[in-house]
């Protein structure tokens, strides 16, 4: 499988780039975290599997989602919201892995937000579908 970061030029040794007020492209920043994040993702999804949520209008979202941390983002007929309880398991969302926290706080610091402390993480899984 091709490396998406290489295709997009995100792994290249180039300086960070401000792309809009308050938004910075941190090329290659996450690469040192990949192995730890993927391992931790397996632990998170074992407790809170990916699912296709429903919009308030009844459409099933194409992206599969899960959450970790103190709250999780939800979408269903009742609307969009954050909740501390996973509606599919009836339990709290899994704790946010330390490597997720390190990635988020490091990226925020490099982007100019040194005081950022992550408390929730929405994880999206996009899958390729052939048109038609």
Annotated model-derived regions:
Residues 1-132:
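Non-heme Fe(II) oxygenase metal-center motifs and adjacent flexible, charged/small-residue loops
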């Amino acid at each position: 499988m091709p490396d998406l970061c290489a295709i997009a030029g995100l792994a290249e040794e180039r300086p960070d780039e401000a792309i809009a007020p308050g938004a910075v492209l941190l090329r290659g920043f996450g690469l040192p975290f990949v192995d730890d994040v993927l391992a931790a993702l397996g632990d998170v999804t074992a407790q809170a599997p990916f699912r296709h949520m429903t919009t308030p209008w009844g459409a099933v979202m194409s992206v599969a989602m899960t959450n970790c941390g103190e709250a999780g983002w939800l979408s269903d007929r009742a609307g969009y919201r954050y909740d501390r309880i996973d509606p599919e398991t009836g339990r709290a969302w899994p704790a946010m892995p330390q490597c997720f926290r390190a990635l988020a706080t490091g990226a925020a610091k490099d982007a100019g937000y040194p005081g950022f402390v992550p408390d929730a993480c929405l994880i999206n899984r996009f899958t390729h579908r052939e048109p038609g």
